[in-house]
Design a protein with these regions (language model features):
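Single conserved hydrophobic/aromatic residue that forms the stacking wall/gate
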Residues: 1-15, 20
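TRNA-recognition modules of translation machinery and tRNA-sensing kinases, especially anticodon-binding
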Residues: 16-17, 21-280
Length: 280
């Protein structure tokens, strides 16, 4: 049968207990979103990540430590009359958590798993004319973030991408890993991998995950250092960030890959215990 896009399925089912309309979720799709979040939480905990809930607003100093602020002016929302911005990703909030601190070398790597809403204008080059919930102004994302010793950061990035790949393998979503060229990477990253999911309704691979090693770019701007021994010279940590799962985009991938010819969506096996059913 001809597979539909997630948007087409949502429009067709408007008014039922399951629909996608702009950024509204109803019924079983809300449960599906919660199921993905619950599965991701347990998955990262088993991998040794500490769960963290970051602030959803940061000041300009924190933002400028994590990114080149001018590049994000058309992407993130500023709170009028306040020195505060809504986070475009929890990476920015977590990166600034240890600003002006010296960490103990024996504590590294520190691995954090964060679930948070993210807010983006999706304007200019960052936004495309996408319908439905693939590209929206507000979305939920589970993030991996690591503070690492410099000599270990390449290895940690490999582990992060392996972790994300395993996650999508367990969900049963067809995907591929892409190493980005320097022209396609963000300016703060030294090396970036994307995971792209196959979307049969769109007949295309679409990005659902990105894993970057920022080396000491953020650490130098935020003054985050470490030392292995007392009185030893300090070094800058390396920071790494990666989407484990963008909830709405992963829902689109599930809807397009698990749809049936009778109009149902099979629930990935690892999520069934959270929904209490095998199809929606």
């Amino acid at each position: 049968f001809k597979q539909k896009t997630a948007y087409e399925i949502g429009v067709r089912l408007v008014g039922s207990e399951m629909c996608i309309r702009d950024s509204y979720l109803k019924g079983d799709l809300v449960k599906l979103a919660y199921a993905i979040t619950a599965f991701a939480s347990g998955f990262l905990t088993e991998k040794g990540y500490k769960l963290i809930q970051p602030p959803y607003m940061i000041n300009r100093k924190s933002m400028e430590g994590a990114v080149i602020a001018e590049d994000f002016e058309d992407v993130i929302y500023k709170i009028q009359d306040d020195d505060l911005y809504l986070i475009g990703t929890s990476e920015h909030a977590i990166a600034s958590m240890y600003s002006d601190e010296i960490l103990e070398g024996k504590s590294l790597p520190e691995k954090f798993g964060s679930i948070s809403p993210c807010f983006r204008k999706e304007a200019g080059a960052h936004g495309k004319d996408q319908k439905g919930i693939f590209r929206v102004h507000q979305f939920e994302k589970f993030e991996q973030f690591i503070f690492s010793k410099p000599e270990d950061s390449d290895m940690e990035q490999e582990k992060m991408i392996e972790c994300a790949e395993e996650f999508y393998q367990k969900l049963g979503i067809p995907h591929r890993v892409v190493l980005l060229s320097s022209g396609d990477m963000g300016k703060v990253a030294a090396k970036t991998f994307d995971i792209e999911a196959w979307m049969p309704g769109q007949n295309a691979y679409r990005e659902i995950c990105s894993v970057s090693n920022c080396n000491d770019f953020q650490a130098r701007r935020l003054k985050i250092r470490f030392r292995d021994k007392t009185n030893e010279e300090t070094q800058y940590v390396h920071t790494l960030n990666g989407t484990l799962v963008a909830i709405e985009r992963t829902m689109v991938a599930i809807i397009e890959n698990f749809q049936t010819n009778d109009g149902h969506i099979k629930v990935p096996e690892v999520l069934q215990k959270y929904l209490g059913k095998d199809k929606i």
